[in-house]
Amino acid sequence: IAIKETPSANFYDGLGALKGVDIIAASLGFKVINTRGFNSTSPVRSLQIIDGVDNQSPGLNFSLGNFLGSSELDIMKVEIIQGASSAYYGPNAFNGVISMTTLNPFIKPGLSIQYKFGERQLFENSIRYAEKFQNKNGEDIFAFKINLSYMQAKDWEADNMAAVDGTISSNNPGGYD
């Protein structure tokens, strides 16, 4: 309930309002959660779990925050465990765990649509569709859900189109532009 009451653009930004949690915005779509006072743009300190599954990118060996996470429409609850949790979650949980639980299609079927517009030409939309099927006796036998998200924005704009000159001179000792 504390996250829902925060004046933030999305639930992920709302986590930063919780005690002991810092959020670093590496870009518009990539947020890094840090706990225990270790603030860094590298998200290697916290373990992120979605429905009991580690959300690490195999090639990078760290979670990409909500860049590859669940849609905001599909989140049922988020638990943040601060501190070392290696005894329960393994060696990657030395600085805390972010555990997200998504909505069960058996419990919450239906259609949800969300549109967001904002500065930096932000356009974001999400769609969640879930349906359950019952047998002749009225018992639930199968359910599925589909989540689609799209975000488009200008994170930054390159306005210096001049060629880079890497020559070393007295007014440019490092050879940088």
PLM regions and their residue ranges:
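Extracytoplasmic beta-strand/coil segments of soluble accessory domains associated
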Residues: 12-54, 76-77
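Flexible glycine-rich, low-complexity coil/linker segments exposed to the extracellular/periplasmic environment
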Residues: 174-177
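A general structural signal for stabilizing positions within well-ordered secondary structure
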Residues: 12-15, 69, 88, 136
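Short, polar/charged loop or turn motifs at beta-strand boundaries
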Residues: 1-8, 34-38, 115-119
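Short acidic/polar hinge/loop motifs at secondary-structure boundaries
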Residues: 54-82
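Short beta-strands and strand-coil junctions in structured, solvent-facing domains, enriched
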Residues: 4, 21-23, 41, 55-57, ...
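Flexible glycine-/small-residue-rich
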Residues: 37-39, 50-52, 82, 102-104, ...
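Outer-membrane beta-barrel translocator/receptor signature
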Residues: 57-60, 73-76, 87-171
